[in-house]
Amino acid sequence: MGLVAWISYQKTKGEVDTRDGYFLAGRGLSAVFIAGSMLLTNLSAEQLIGLNGSAYGFNLSSMGWEVTAAFATICMAFLFLPRYLAGAFATLPQFLNDRFDGGVRRMSVILFMIGYGLITIPSVLYAGSIAVLQLFDVPSLLNIPYSQALALTIVVIGCLGAVYAVFGGLKAVAVSDTLNGIGLLIIGIAVPILGLAALGQGSVGDGLYTVANTDTEKLNAIGSEFDPTPFATLFTGMIFANLFYWCTNQYVIQRTLAAKNLAEGQKGVLFSGFFK
């Protein structure tokens, strides 16, 4: 984390003195940084812990969130992004103000802040902190009660995450997201390989055979009405939820508004959709 912070600082030094430099990375982000930042913004504790937990407890039907996300990123690249960049908007509320009026802009800001403050950020910090407590046994390490360790971990994670954005602006966030994303991608590939090897007593093939022939109902990706993600919801509520998330969610699309041009922005969005 220290190395990522240092590289991010070097990349953004002297570039956060203006509004566009701070909030839009000088409108100079390339496709690689846009894709990396979008993926890391999306891939937080609720995905790593929530979706894995859902697959373990039920089946693979929760992958529907990722399947419909790919469609949403295509819509973002070819329908929404050209309009955002054509108007040189800095935020989605600014776009809504131009499209409708100031009342709609203010209402959207209030709704976004309530959603981030009461739903998104608390769930991410809470789930991430529980994972850290389990991995490093923080209560025993610091000799403090579990509740205190949880609160301390939440504060530390929140402060570490805020440092990038507050002092480095959007470009620092994009750079750090991309660098962390490389490590996460490597680890994400290594974990199932190592897990299958351990399950197969050193053989990935044997491990894969065991998975394919044990509790096979968990490999079902077509969710029933009793699963967390019923199949029918892919064509009703879920597709609209993903269209909101990938096309109009401020903290996701902010990276695309900072693209150096439309082509780079579209490539970045489509690249993130490919990995989804």
Task: Identify the meaning behind each predicted range.
Residues M1-V4, L48, A72-L79, A88-F89, ...:
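Membrane-embedded alpha-helical core segments of multi-pass
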Residues A5, L39, S61-A165, G237-Y245:
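Helix-loop-helix module between adjacent transmembrane segments
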Residues W6-L29, R83-A90, Q94, V104, ...:
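Membrane-helix boundary/linker segments in multi-pass transporters
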Residues G26-L29, F33, G50-G64, N97, ...:
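Loop-to-helix junctions at membrane interfaces in multi-pass transport proteins
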Residues G36, L111-G115, S176, F271-S272:
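Hydrophobic alpha-helical segments of secondary membrane carriers
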Residues T153-I157, V175-L179, G268-F271:
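Hydrophobic core positions of alpha-helical segments in small-molecule transporters
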